């Protein structure tokens, strides 16, 4: 946990600076509800084999990572293993939410963002910064979408990308389509 995390990651506090995020989050969540079971994994995802090994044990994955490398690893592992992925991302005053499901003719994260993104000013996500309230809104939307998927209720976000502009207080929804040349889910990959 770093001081710069505190304004946008409310699960951590000042006393947690220097601790592993996974430990800090588990401690906070257990303090909120001591009856829940939390399974932690103290690893940094930096290899596809590692991501697949971790993700293989779950039915649904929520990704809220703050860097493109991890987002790609999580996406690729979910696609390869056929696991539903609910992905939320934020940068500056904007957020986006999408769901990928196995068997759905919908775009995966890599289809929509084939190259590691940057802002108009050429800054990475960490350099551009994040307005803290945007993470709260996107986290709530992500949790709602994940629960809908697990319970099989409501309309799935699969095949759509939701974008939120906090400065304009405007949501936009666009239909997405898989990229047949996508290295994660494209036609050549699927045919094997």
Language model segments and positions:
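Adenine nucleotide-associated cytosolic modules
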Residues: 1-192
């Amino acid at each position: 946990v770093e001081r710069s995390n505190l304004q946008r990651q409310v699960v951590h506090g000042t006393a947690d600076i220097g601790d592993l995020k996974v430990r800090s989050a588990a401690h906070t969540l257990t303090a909120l509800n001591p009856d829940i079971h939390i399974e932690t994994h103290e690893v940094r995802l930096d290899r596809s084999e590692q991501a697949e090994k971790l993700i293989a044990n779950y039915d649904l994955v929520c990704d809220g990572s703050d860097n493109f490398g991890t987002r790609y690893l999580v996406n690729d592992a979910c696609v390869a293993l056929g696991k539903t992925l609910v992905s939320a991302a934020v940068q500056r005053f904007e957020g986006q939410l999408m769901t990928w499901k196995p068997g759905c003719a919908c775009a995966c994260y890599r289809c929509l963002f084939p190259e590691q993104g940057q802002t108009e000013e050429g800054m990475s996500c960490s350099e551009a910064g994040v307005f803290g309230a945007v993470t709260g809104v996107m986290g709530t939307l992500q949790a709602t979408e994940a629960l809908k998927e697990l319970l099989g209720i409501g309309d799935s976000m699969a095949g759509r990308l939701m974008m939120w502009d906090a400065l304009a207080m405007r949501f936009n929804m666009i239909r997405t389509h898989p990229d047949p040349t996508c290295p994660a889910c494209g036609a050549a990959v699927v045919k094997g």
